[in-house]
Design a protein with these regions (language model features):
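ABC ATP-binding cassette signature C-motif
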Residues: 1-169
Length: 169
């Protein structure tokens, strides 16, 4: 069977418990390898993934946990800003990658996401959050890198009705 998903489309999976929905999503997100068949996606496609059971760093703040979703981008920004021995080609490639991901606006995007998804304040310790608040932080974590593909496994777990409706839209 073939499944093709195009930009802007929403696809949902429905099936009984234990039939492999989560495993399929892990393969699509790139966190697991397929035993058979093949997955092809656009080269350089950034994927955001919120698994069914999402672990946050309880010792960190809300903001730190969300920023961790952009770790690769933050690494590129740091390398661009601190590396003195980059060739002009390497500098250009890093600049393009950062520009493409809108990396220079990461902090403003963080604030916008937190407001839109109604997360607790960025300096709040994660260990004090409810399940629904943690799920909102996890959603921001998946969205902060502006993924071209967003994979959500049981995205409405622990969310109130208002947030469930907002997520559906």
């Amino acid at each position: 069977a073939t499944l093709a998903v195009y930009p802007g489309e929403k696809v949902g999976l429905v099936g009984r418990n234990g039939c492999g929905k989560s495993t399929f999503l892990q393969i699509i997100a790139g966190t697991e390898e397929a035993d058979a068949g093949q997955i092809s996606r656009k080269q350089g496609l950034v994927t955001g993934y919120l698994p069914q059971e999402f672990e946050l760093n309880d010792a960190a703040t809300v903001g730190e946990n969300i920023r961790a979703g952009a770790a690769e981008l933050l690494g590129k920004i740091e390398r661009f800003e601190t590396a003195n021995n980059l060739s002009p080609v390497e500098q250009e490639q890093l600049q393009q990658a950062i520009d493409h991901a809108d990396g220079w606006n990461l902090e403003s995007r963080l604030k916008i996401l937190m407001r839109e998804i109604s997360t607790p304040p960025a300096d709040r310790q994660v260990s004090y959050l409810s399940g629904g608040e943690k799920r909102r932080v996890g959603l921001c974590h998946a969205l902060i890198s502006q993924p071209g593909l967003l994979v959500l496994d049981e995205p409405t777990n622990h969310l109130d009705m208002e947030m469930r409706q907002a997520l559906a839209n």
